[in-house]
């Protein structure tokens, strides 16, 4: 077993990069909050990925939060290469509010980022993005917290995904 799998299951995201004819969508698990004030996030991307090239070229990306409803699109984004895969996907690209990179209409949330740092660590580059805007579906984030009924996706291994249960166990 590969050691990094000990950290799974992990939330799954769609990373949108580029714009116009160069728009690309990649599935990614390695996404994290770096700071909440200011709101800064990071994503690890392998240099061989089209997404890597486009983030470096344009200095922007969007983190889209998918639900179980777009699992087929997540699978395509994670297993196919290059912008041509968008023709196989059913998601709708819409203009973002603050960046040129489009957002995904069907996403539970779209987080718009401008790159403020990028460093290579092993076989990936960690892109750090300042969040300059975001949108979300009201039903997915009720009362300021995630509504688990929205079916947020988590990746278990290769083609296996789970959603979070509706039961919330409270620590006492």
UniProtKB/Swiss-Prot annotation:
Keywords: Flavoprotein, FMN. SMART domains: Flavin_Reduct. Its cofactor is FMN. One of its GO terms (molecular function) is FMN binding. Pfam families: Flavin_Reduct. Belongs to the flavoredoxin family. This is Uncharacterized protein PH0856. It comes from Pyrococcus horikoshii (strain ATCC 700860 / DSM 12428 / JCM 9974 / NBRC 100139 / OT-3).
């Amino acid at each position: 077993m590969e050691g990094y799998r000990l950290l799974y299951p992990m939330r799954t995201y769609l990373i949108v990069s580029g714009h116009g004819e160069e728009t690309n969508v990649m599935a990614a698990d390695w996404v994290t909050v770096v700071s909440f004030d200011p709101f800064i996030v990071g994503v690890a991307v392998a240099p061989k990925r089209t997404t890597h090239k486009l983030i470096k070229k344009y200095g922007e990306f969007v983190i889209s939060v998918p639900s179980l409803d777009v699992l087929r699109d997540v699978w395509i984004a994670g297993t196919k290469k290059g912008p041509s895969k968008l023709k196989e996907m059913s998601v709708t690209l819409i203009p973002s509010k603050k960046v040129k990179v489009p957002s995904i209409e069907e996403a539970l949330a779209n987080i718009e980022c401008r790159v403020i740092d990028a460093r290579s660590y092993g076989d990936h580059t960690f892109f750090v993005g300042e969040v300059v805007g975001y949108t979300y579906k009201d039903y997915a984030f009720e009362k300021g917290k995630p509504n688990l009924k929205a079916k947020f996706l988590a990746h278990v291994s290769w083609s296996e995904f789970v959603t979070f249960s509706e039961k919330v166990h409270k620590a006492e």
